[in-house]
From Swiss-Prot:
Extracellular side: 113-115, 187-252, 298-324, 381-421, 484-494, 559-574
Binding site for Na(+) 1: G94, V97, L434, D437, S438
Record protein name field: Sodium-dependent serotonin transporter
Xref: NCBIfam families: Na_transp (NF037979)
Glycosylation sites: N208, N217
Gene (UniProt): Slc6a4
Disulfide bonds: C200-C209
Misc remark: This protein is the target of psychomotor stimulants such as amphetamines or cocaine.
Organism: Rattus norvegicus (Rat)
Residue list for modification Phosphotyrosine: Y47, Y142
UniProtKB keywords: Antiport, Cell junction, Cell membrane, Cell projection, Disulfide bond, Endosome, Glycoprotein, Membrane, Metal-binding, Neurotransmitter transport, Phosphoprotein, Sodium, Synapse, Transmembrane, Transmembrane helix, Transport
Length: 630
């Protein structure tokens, strides 16, 4: 008897008309023909509903059927899956909870009405952020592909979205890990009996350095600077050696060594796939919560802590009448949860087919939002302490935003606490682990996408491809390691990646809800989970979530941020440069649409129909289909 060798690369299975194919335990969903799409009985994207058969027939229960003869390729062996369910949850939480939760949310909250800001933030999370988060998890888990090849199974004409996501991920890796390098430099500098940013007697200090904690009756002038500020600006960043974007200065060898060390850790954490990264996140995703708990208890016991808490949460309801508050709430929840970056697609693609991604979406979203909220207490109890020590209002202490809030204000507060070295070490180690989680996720999104799209080239060479990606990211980070690197980091964050990712997410939401079809998408979810998403989710996916993204994009275009950093005003040409960098990723979408229409044979109408019709089947493990649909 002839048998198929276990190491064979593929098995060809021919599907007859109006049938789904079952081969080697895998259910193949076929692709409809152009004629079938025109039939009024067809549901979205041309799939026709197949009536349920008897309970004994496990091969098909309300599964959309193929309406054409199809030769489908089935690869031997199953896709890699997470070792444990908790590996996946910790990876998603580690990705969503990043540095922005620690510095951005508390600052935006108090700037936009304190406790009143929680209302628009919650509304935007419920109607915008969480539905998009759930959509990506469901898409990735059902189709089991990265952000490039998944579009062959959804709507091929939008495959450029995947390429755009990969380019954006590279830009983010180029500047985000530089911030982690700053934290690592601080961590190494903290391994002393006395923290170096506590005095004005170091080689990098200037005559304006004033340590108001050292003695009483210190006169603070407009030109006075704190030891922590000079350590950050003149020693770590060496910003005084740069005149701006037009003259970035030399590359810091100290920061270069830090970023090489960081990417070395990243490489050995993700080179073997989710089996290894899923174990690493047990440390990197849980350690920040231990440190946050310690810092929260310590901050609450400091004198003046209550002043900071009141300043953080005191509601200003009049702020809700300002459009900017709602824009900030929408942007914060979107960038915090992180749909549109391809990461959720990649992570979910390694889940088991019947994993409850609906529950996962709710749990991880709530954990992320609560972490942001609690981080505000960690930050503002310390700011209240700083205000008490300076005999100033909390608003005067909380003027720093972004990384400066952590590397200047919070670092200075830690330096003047008892056991300052201990708290400095755990604080900066927490920042590093927060950043590493997000980098693991961002690069895994790219790696999964490329390996799924080019399996014959890279499937058995993952370690080498990961090495290429890591080296490319290190080289891309060189500009941010210069004396003026902080200027580059801010430009990339505000203009090169933010608007681009919003645009990509908007097109993705429209492509899934309007082209692939909300009916078909909900049918897919029902096959996995045994129940169909309710009307709330359908309305959000079809209308509210796209409008949510469009609202942020339009607000950004009408009122783009005026960049200013460390008394440096960005020139107009730099803003144009930022937009151009952002467009270099988004341009992949219309470029691929044009390429697809040109390369597809037939009339224009036939080309369009073929280009929006799924071209490859979705493999569904038959034993994993839920039959208890309600």
């Amino acid at each position: 008897m002839e048998t198929t060798p276990l190491n064979s690369q593929k098995v060809l299975s021919e599907c007859k008309d109006r049938e789904d194919c079952q081969e080697n335990g895998v259910l193949q969903k076929g692709v409809p023909t152009t004629a079938d799409r025109a039939e009024p009985s067809q549901i979205s994207n041309g799939y026709s509903a197949v009536p349920s058969t008897s309970a004994g027939d496990e091969a098909s229960h309300s599964i959309p059927a193929a309406t054409t003869t199809l030769v489908a390729e089935i690869r031997q062996g199953e896709r890699e899956t997470w070792g444990k369910k908790m590996d996946f949850l910790l990876s998603v939480i580690g990705y969503a909870v990043d540095l922005g939760n620690i510095w951005r949310f508390p600052y935006i909250c108090y700037q936009n009405g304190g406790g009143a800001f929680l209302l628009p933030y919650t509304i935007m999370a419920i109607f915008g952020g969480i539905p998009l988060f759930y959509m990506e998890l469901a898409l990735g888990q059902y189709h089991r592909n990265g952000c490039i090849s998944i579009w062959r199974k959804i709507c091929p004409i939008f495959k450029g979205i995947g390429y755009a996501i990969c380019i954006i991920a590279f830009y983010i890796a180029s500047y985000y890990n530089t911030i982690i390098a700053w934290a690592l430099y601080y961590l190494i500098s903290s391994l002393t009996d006395r923290l170096p940013w506590t005095s004005c007697t170091n080689s990098w200090n200037t005559g304006n350095c004033t340590n108001y904690f050292a003695q009483d009756n210190i006169t603070w002038t407009l030109h006075s600077t704190s030891p922590a500020e000079e350590f950050y600006l003149r020693h770590v960043l060496q910003i005084h050696q740069s005149k701006g974007l037009q003259d970035l200065g030399t590359i810091s060898w100290q920061l270069t060594l830090c970023i090489v060390l960081i990417f070395t850790v990243i490489y050995f954490s993700i080179w073997k796939g989710v089996k290894t990264s899923g174990k690493v996140v047990w440390v990197t995703a849980t350690f920040p919560y231990i440190v946050l708990s310690v810092l929260l208890v310590r901050g609450a016991t400091l004198p003046g802590a209550w002043r900071g808490v009141v300043f953080y949460l005191k509601p200003n309801w009049q702020k809700l009448l300002e459009t900017g508050v709602w824009v900030d709430a929408a942007a914060q929840i979107f960038f915090s949860l992180g749909p549109g970056f391809g990461v959720l697609l990649a992570f979910a693609s390694y889940n088991k087919f019947n994993n409850n991604c609906y529950q996962d979406a709710l749990v991880t979203s709530v954990v992320n939002c609560m972490t942001s909220f609690v981080s505000g207490f960690v930050i503002f109890t310390v700011l209240g302490y700083m205000a008490e020590m300076r005999n100033e209002d909390v608003s005067e202490v909380a003027k720093d935003a972004g990384p400066s809030l952590l590397f200047i204000t919070y670092a200075e507060a830690i330096a003047n606490m008892p056991a300052s070295t201990f708290f400095a070490i755990i604080f900066f180690l927490m920042l590093i682990t927060l950043g590493l989680d997000s980098t693991f996720a961002g690069l895994e999104g790219v790696i999964t996408a490329v390996l799924d799209e080019f399996p014959h080239i890279w499937a058995k060479r993952r370690e080498w491809f990961v090495l290429i990606v890591v080296i490319t990211c290190v080289l891309g980070s060189l500009l941010t390691l210069t004396s003026g690197g902080a200027y580059v980091v801010t430009l990339l964050e505000e203009y090169a990646t933010g608007p681009a990712v919003l645009t990509v997410a908007l097109i993705e939401a429209v492509a899934v809800s309007w082209f692939y079809g909300i009916t078909q998408f909900c049918s897919d979810v029902k096959e996995m989970l045994g129940f169909s998403p309710g009307w709330f989710w359908r309305i959000c996916w079809v209308a509210i979530s796209p409008l949510f993204l469009l609202f942020i994009i339009c607000s950004f275009l009408m009122s783009p941020p005026q960049l200013r950093l460390f008394q440096y005003n960005y020139p107009h040409w730099s803003i144009v440069l930022g937009y151009c960098i952002g467009m270099s990723s988004v341009i992949c979408i219309p470029t691929y649409i044009i390429y697809r229409l040109i390369s597809t044979p037939g009339t224009l109408k036939e080309r369009i129909i073929k280009s929006i019709t799924p071209e490859t089947p979705t493999e569904i493990p038959c034993g994993d289909i839920r039959m208890n649909a309600v």
